[in-house]
UniProtKB/Swiss-Prot annotation:
A Pfam family that the UniProt record links to this protein: Pantoate_ligase
One biological process term in Gene Ontology: pantothenate biosynthetic process
Compartments where found: Cytoplasm
GO MF, any single term: pantoate-beta-alanine ligase activity
Record Gene3D superfamilies: HUPs, Pantoate-beta-alanine ligase, C-terminal domain
Protein name per Swiss-Prot or TrEMBL: Pantothenate synthetase
Key words of the record: ATP-binding, Cytoplasm, Ligase, Nucleotide-binding, Pantothenate biosynthesis
Gene name of the encoded protein: panC
EC number: 6.3.2.1
NCBIfam families xref list: cyt_tran_rel (TIGR00125), panC (TIGR00018)
SUPFAM superfamilies named in the record: Nucleotidylyl transferase
A GO CC term attached to the entry: cytosol
Annotated catalysed reactions: (R)-pantoate + beta-alanine + ATP = (R)-pantothenate + AMP + diphosphate + H(+)
């Protein structure tokens, strides 16, 4: 396995692989890899001849009051995990390598980024789409792998790929959870022992909402109210949003007549956590 930090170095290997007719899987990450990331990497290794894992804490997707400087980094552990998983290249560039000092070109997906996380994190998805576009160009990936936990990101990337005719297949992978139900996240490292226990209100709230949906309730307001009541049982929890939206367009719905995404964001102490599930009508 190779650990590279220069774009041209990655391109050199990609060109060789393409000449040989090999398929390439890309797993874009911000590092601090956990079992959720590993599930993406394992699938990429299984489905492609070569796999590139990018480890890059992307400054352009963090707002001015967000946790860029504090975001957990563990490159040695990340490289070890990737090596054991059968990854071909770990791409770990510096921000100066990814962005020219006078860069003025960005990729922005409209409408889908207006709600959910996009409503509170101005510029976040512009940063995500720009860096992912660059990674697509650098890697020339056959397939790229994203987790369902970042459901809005997955929907936005799919739309960007469609609209801009990127020649890459987007593969969405299921949420990986701890044994007690908490969705795996790099930000879980921020949680104190007490906060870690309180964080379970996210998965419990979603489970309550899911029970109503599978029990035949179709009124969005009832679903949201039930989830809200469960989350409010935590004295450390502060709700950012609870939304029920169309699973494709991400537009809010009042009565559930098609597949929907039920998504929540909650602050546990100072740590913002997200979780979600997709309800498919007819299942």
């Amino acid at each position: 396995m190779l650990k590279l930090n220069k774009i041209n170095e990655v391109k050199k290997y990609v060109d060789e692989w393409k000449k040989e007719g090999l398929t390439i899987g890309l797993v874009p990450t911000m590092g601090c890899l956990h079992e959720g990331h590993k599930s993406l990497i394992d699938r990429a290794v299984k489905e492609n001849d070569k796999v590139i894992v990018s480890v890059f804490v992307n400054p352009t997707q963090f707002g001015p009051n967000e946790d860029f400087d504090k975001y957990p980094r563990s490159i040695e552990n990340d490289v070890d995990l990737c090596n054991k998983a059968g990854v071909s290249i770990v791409f770990n560039p510096d921000p100066k390598e990814m962005y020219f000092h006078d860069a003025c070109t960005y990729v922005n997906v409209e409408n889908l980024t207006d709600g959910l996380c996009g409503a509170k994190r101005e510029g976040h998805f512009r940063g995500v789409c720009t860096v992912v576009s660059k990674l697509f160009n650098i890697s020339q990936a056959t397939r790229a792998y994203f987790g369902q936990k970042d459901a809005q990101q997955l929907a936005v990337i799919k739309r960007m790929v469609r609209d801009l005719n990127f020649n890459v297949e987007i593969v969405g992978c299921p949420i990986v959870r701890e044994s007690d139900g908490l969705a795996k996240s790099s930000r879980n490292k921020y949680l104190s022992k007490e906060e870690r226990v309180e964080a379970l209100v996210l998965s419990r709230g979603l489970r309550k909402g899911k029970e109503l949906l599978y029990g035949g309730i179709r009124k969005t307001s009832k679903i949201k109210e039930t989830i809200e009541n469960e989350i409010k049982k935590s004295h450390l929890g502060k709700i950012d949003y609870i939304e029920v939206v169309d699973s494709i367009t991400l537009e809010p719905v009042e009565n559930i007549e098609r597949d929907v995404l039920v998504a929540i964001a909650v602050f546990i102490g100072k740590t913002r956590l997200i979780d979600n599930f997709i309800f498919k009508l007819g299942e």
